[in-house]
Amino acid sequence: MITNRCSSLLTRSVALTLSVTALPGIACAFDPYGTWMRPSTGTQVNFYDCAGKLCAKIVAVKDERRKSKIGTVIMAGAIKSADNQWKGDLLNADDGKVYTGVVTMQGPNALNLKGCVAFVCQGETWTEG
């Protein structure tokens, strides 16, 4: 009886130890779907699924002079390129130029959006809006 109890306890102990030590190796996947705010302008952008790809459009602006930008699709058809990362064309709604865009989730409440031309990139971390 004691041997069975000890054996059972040992098995549980080993199982618990293995599961706890495996935790640091687990990667958390976050997705960008929802509304995010660009801190530099107060613009809110909704990221949504479009035929299995990532799209984004402007849904609100802080500056009334930018009101005409509401509804502008700034990203269409971005594909998942790595865990927590999507790549696709990114429209700068202010100047009409298209850049290579990279969306990277930095956690459940932080999205980094980066636009690149050749090897020059600029990015900004956005918060949930």
Regions found by a protein language model. Name each.
Residues 32-100:
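Central antiparallel beta-sheet cores of small beta-barrel/beta-sandwich binding domains
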Residues 15-17, 27:
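Cleavable N-terminal signal peptides
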Residues 100-124:
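Short, exposed beta-strand-loop hairpins at the edges of beta-sheets
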Residues 2-15:
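Bacterial N-terminal signal peptides that target proteins for export
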Residues 23-29:
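Sec/Tat signal peptide C-region and signal peptidase I cleavage site
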Residues 128-129:
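Short, solvent-exposed mixed-charge patches
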